[in-house]
Amino acid sequence: MDQGAMETLPEKPSEDEFSLALRNGLILCNVLNKVNPGSVLKVVENPITPAIQYADGAAQSAIQYFENMRNFLKAVEDMQLLTFGASDLEKGGSSNKVVDCILCLKGFYEWKQAGGVGVWRYGGTVRIVSFNRKGSSPPQYGIGSESTTDESVSLDESESSQYDQLLDFLHLSNEISAEESETAISLAFLFDHFALQLLHGYLKESDGINDMPLNEMVIDTLLNRVVKDFSAILVSQGAQLGSFLRKILKCDNGDLSRSEFLAAVFRYLQHRKDLVSKEFSKFCKCGGKLEFSRLNAREFSPGHVEAIGLQQKELEEVKSNFVETRSQVKQMQSEWQKELQRIVHHVKAMEVTSSSYHKVLEENRLLYNEVQDLKGTIRVYCRVRPFFQEQKDMQSTVDYIGENGNIIINNPFKQEKDARKIFSFNKVFGQTVSQEQIYIDTQPVIRSVLDGFNVCIFAYGQTGSGKTYTMSGPDLMTETTWGVNYRALRDLFQLSNARTHVVTYEIGVQMIEIYNEQVRDLLVSDGSSRRLDIRNNSQLNGLNVPDANLIPVSNTRDVLDLMRIGQKNRAVGATALNERSSRSHSVLTVHVQGKELASGSILRGCLHLVDLAGSERVEKSEAVGERLKEAQHINKSLSALGDVIYALAQKSSHVPYRNSKLTQVLQDSLGGQAKTLMFVHINPEVNAVGETISTLKFAQRVASIELGAARSNKETGEIRDLKDEISSLKSAMEKKEAELEQLRSGSIRNTTECQRARAVSPFHLPRTGNGAGTKAEASPQPNDGTRSYETRSCSTGKQRKSGFPSALRNREASPRMPNLAEERLNPSPSRRSLSTDRASTIKSRNKPDVTQNLPVSRTPFPARVPVVKSFSTVPLNPSAENNHRLHTDNSSEAFQNHQKLSARKLFPEIEEEHIRHALHIRQGGVKKTRAESSKAKAKQPSPARFQKLDVGISLRSDADSEAKVGNYQTQKGNNNHNVIHSRFQNFDVGISLFSDLCAGDKSDSTLKSDSSETDNEPPSKSKNAQRNSSKNSLNHKLRTIYAHEDTSLVDDKPSNGTAHIKEGNNNISMPEFRRSRSTHHARFMVP
């Protein structure tokens, strides 16, 4: 209460510090003036700080000290409050009195602040109540103090201190304080009632006396009399109570203990309460004593008395009813309290259940989305457009929207069952849903683009249903109205920036529109409308429209600028249904490419955000002219989209994607391994209920489509290596195909010569150097005068095409076989075509650049090393020196050289075939149709044909072999004759069989080559595969025959592979037919 005390006194002062601060009286005077203003008129100001610094107070002035303390003690004494002496503030003084005085000031101040109602009594220390003696005025306060007057009753200083110490242990409760206040009120009420009744009696007695006026003096005199009488009653009652207490103390049993005394006092109070409570309550409530009421009742008539009695009875009944009603109300309150507690517990249980239900519902939603991802089902979200400001009072066709994705449409134009239709989708958004809530449900799907998935989100619905509002938003300047397009790009930027330390992303944007079945680029600044082409499955990075501008973006500001340009360039027009109707399909494509920093893997994702133009009825939209043409194209493209959806829902083998540009753009999203989501928008107006129901039916068909689990476009390092290998193999294959085309033209010329030279069998040719059919001038003659022939199958160019793979030609021209140079030092022999029914010679073609065409010296039995690219002669009558030299060669060395060359030719060919087969599988080779399979089967020779050929071949071979081998039977033993005879017989059969098959295939293939080729697949692949299979089977049979004969003649053959028969001076060399293992064709050598 005093600012000086707050500054000088510490927070928790000691007793000496407290006494020292109050010694000058300045703080006490200031506090008293705040408690009772004007109590101390003159306060002597003096510095406080020096007084506190010195404990003996040497800095204080004696005059100031005594003047402030004297004024404070005098004012407190006048207020009849507790006081103390000046010596109590000195060292060794009693600080209890000082504290009691200050607490008494505090209690008095709080009583005044509360309004000063009733009599204030200090309950903290001893209270000495004193009354004035005879003739004195009553006290102003209910608190006695140490008074120096003669009329007051005071206690000694020692007695006061004794009682102070005694009452320090007494603590009155709040209930006793409340009872004391009630007693004071009751006494005041009794005093007022006593005084007023006395005044009433006086005025009534002096009513007829005029000499007794009514003035202030009369009232003062009357009140003084009342006070005296009331004081006398109180004094008398105090004397009675004192005598009763003294009587209790002076009992026969001796001194009572404190507990016994308190028990006796309590019993007395209870007895007095029981005696006077009833009368006192009646007196207080009814307004006076019963005697006074009885006296007044005499003045009323009997009717009034009876009425008062009835009223009294009614009042009693009302009281009883009130008591009963109050008890009932209390009982009902208790019941209601119990019911309220039960409801509270039930609500809490419901809250727990509801929270667990929502938790389970959220888990079910997440699991459902995972199942949908695994199935690849198109997710369908339905959004109901809110009414416009002027349409708020219109009837809505949406009857109910459920939390589980159900929506009920009420058709007012139908009755009973047909009036209500239920549709179920993944989720349904009502009219009050914000743009942010729409995007939250689509956010997980959009974010999967950064993981390498392809995502497509498109909006479908009739015109004016809010598709553009959902996808783009009405205003790009207001964040609350941003559509899915901008929110998706902003979210992708935020997420890509958060993953910078793991993956680096590059984001590009394309924006096109399909207007009147023409694809146009919206991100152009010059307003040009260049026509763009759609290329499905041509680009691995999702660029279906590669000619459109792909603009890289790095922040949201770039996206806003691009979207403004796109919306500005988009075709928009006004119709009767919508003032700003989109007249084209808009496609915003976001291309994302990321690279993992740890593994180096490439992630490619593509996000298509499609805003479809709304379907409309021409009679409602009132479209004419250009608007009519736009509406027709829009409806046609949406109809094509419906056909595609129906085909996908029915799992049809053919899906008509190419019926519209729109379906071509959405082909990868609807039919590929992508995550697809569709927003279906409906108009709640009654006049649009038909379009609403048809739109929801279309959405239900879309929801039933299962595209299969989406796959991430993640390219690891191994995949990139394999792709590089595939590209290199493709380039090598293209190079070999070009070489194959060059070889095909040469094969056609060789086929013509082969057909012209099928007249004479090689066994019947004259054994001279210049036969009729040999055409020796076409090939150079060797130095030793010998001439060689080559047996060659007569097949068509197309048949020969599959037998000359490009890889084989490259290997023949490459210097990878150095052993061939040592084995081919002799002049190259000429080759001859051989057939079973007719024979002819073919002009040989010399290729000096090829290593295989080097000249080879003639031996009686040529080695099994075919020379593919040249024709030369083989000597029929070798010289004796040559025969003698070849006879002395080591046969085992020739056999080893033959095996080396055969293996060197065979294994690269198998490797090439494996490579071509693997490439064919990786590229997803052409699948043969049934017609092509039947044609391939027809080309294979039947078993009956083989039987006929075997018969003819065996007869011819027997005749020829007997004529040729008969000359040798006289020169050699039977053993050699049997071996050679069996070898020629077996080889003759194989060669004849192979030649006839080749001739038959040639004629068949020549007639059917044009008719069997289709536009959709290459004409040569299936045919070559069939010819190769038949040739391989035949080659296998010939190799079996040759291997059987080769085991019996290994010991008798010279090094060059010629079977030499010698008797006497005559040397005769027998021809040997062998198949080359270097190509698919059956080629044999005839010496």
Swiss-Prot record:
Tissue expression from the record: Expressed in roots, leaves, stems and flowers (at protein level).
Kinesin motor domain ranges (all copies): 377-705
Subcellular location: Cytoplasm, Cytoskeleton; Mitochondrion
Compositionally biased intervals (Basic residues): 1076-1087
Biological processes annotated in GO: aerobic respiration; microtubule-based movement; seed germination
Keyword Transferase attributed: no
Segments of skewed composition (Polar residues): 744-754, 780-797, 836-856, 1017-1033
Pfam families according to UniProt: CH, Kinesin
Origin organism lineage: Eukaryota, Viridiplantae, Streptophyta, Embryophyta, Tracheophyta
Official protein name in the record: Kinesin-like protein KIN-14F
Free-text function comment from the UniProt entry: Required for keeping the ATP levels stable and balancing the aerobic respiration pathways during seed germination at low temperature.
